[in-house]
Amino acid sequence: MLNDFKIDPLVKNKSPSATTAVVAMSGGVDSSVAAALLHKLGYKVIGITLQLYNNTTGKGACCGSLDTQDAKQVASIMGFPHYTLNYEKVFKEEVIDDFIDTYMQGKTPIPCIKCNQVVKFRDLLNATKSLDADILVTGHYIRKIEQDDDIYVYSSKDTKKDQSYFLFATTIEQLKFLRFPLGNFHKDNIRKLAEHFNLPIANKPDSQNICFVADTYKNTIAQLRPNAIKKGNIIDTSGNILGQHDGIVNFTIGQRRGIGLSSKEPLYVIKLNPDTNEVTVGHKSALLQNKLHIEKINWLVKDKIPHTGLNVKVKLRSSHSGSTAIVYPNDNNKATVLLQDTYCTVTPGQACVIYDGDRMLGGGWIC
């Protein structure tokens, strides 16, 4: 069966037996198979799981204590070493606190991108280098191709599982050290390979939830930052008060359910104002836009965005199939995106990821 899972050498001019690969193991199917496959192919695998938070439920998330046990069991079955690193402090300070701060600013965060950006691909990558390993490997569904000293990043062959959206903030320097061996395969075949290796996680469900949110965002924020929950007014687009809310952290742009108001026509959250603590609601027509602004751009291409604009495809959320757009550069690492032939809900705090076909060019944060 291994003949169906051929991968190119992960390090140029170096055999698998001479290559030390640290594999970031979340305890799920994908990273477990990535580690097991490389071990079978002769790589010197070291499995590392990050302890990020205190959660023993293991329900629909990742990197909890039960997931650490699963990762250790996989390593034991396959016969390669496994270690757990405690990153709870940095995860709390740079991911969880940022998650709460972003909601308090009236934006909708994506903590998984932040975790990749600062914990996995900064701190874990540095730890990998300190072990004198050659590469850091993950189970993400994304493709990376190196050619003539250039790095090209593409969406996964399995478009339903593609995770390029969540990795847009990964820098070229980080990508030089990272490897994604599952990018050319489909998830169904990865599960079959897990069964072939007799791994106990072969039928483990995919993680769906934000790992540190045990039940709801509101309860998590209220527990960690009680002063973030402040009552305020719900107003219409003309400024008329329609009712009250229990905190803007309970809302996101485009939200329809849970507003707490009755109306003949559906009402949507149009705007969140943290300065006045007001939630503006209105009809769907007031929600759709064809222009947005992005900041803190991570650009993976040598050529800069031309001032005349660049024709691209953009994804405004992970499940978004993509919209054609023109991107115009601005000062201070910002850009303006004009959607072509479509209007979308634009949610500050989310990512706008930019593609040329299936090649990821980079992206930025919607502001």
UniProtKB/Swiss-Prot annotation:
Residues annotated as catalytic: 115, 211
Annotated GO CC locations: cytoplasm
Any single Pfam family the record assigns to this protein: tRNA_Me_trans_C
Site (Interaction with tRNA) location in chain: 140, 350
Record localization: Cytoplasm
Enzyme's top EC category: transferase
First and last residue of the signal peptide: none
Disulphides: 115-211
InterPro entries according to UniProt: MnmA-like (IPR004506), MnmA-like_C (IPR046885), MnmA-like_central (IPR046884), MnmA-like_central_sf (IPR023382), Rossmann-like_a/b/a_fold (IPR014729)
Region (Interaction with tRNA): 161-163
GO molecular function, one term: ATP binding
Binding locations of ATP: 24-31, 50, 139
Keyword annotations from UniProtKB, A to Z: ATP-binding, Cytoplasm, Disulfide bond, Nucleotide-binding, RNA-binding, Transferase, tRNA processing, tRNA-binding
PANTHER family in the cross-refs: MITOCHONDRIAL TRNA-SPECIFIC 2-THIOURIDYLASE 1 (PTHR11933:SF5), TRNA 5-METHYLAMINOMETHYL-2-THIOURIDYLATE -METHYLTRANSFERASE (PTHR11933)
Record's function text: Catalyzes the 2-thiolation of uridine at the wobble position (U34) of tRNA, leading to the formation of s(2)U34.
Homology family: Belongs to the MnmA/TRMU family.
NCBIfam families named in the record: PRK00143.1, trmU
Protein name: tRNA-specific 2-thiouridylase MnmA
Organism listed in the record: Ehrlichia chaffeensis (strain ATCC CRL-10679 / Arkansas)
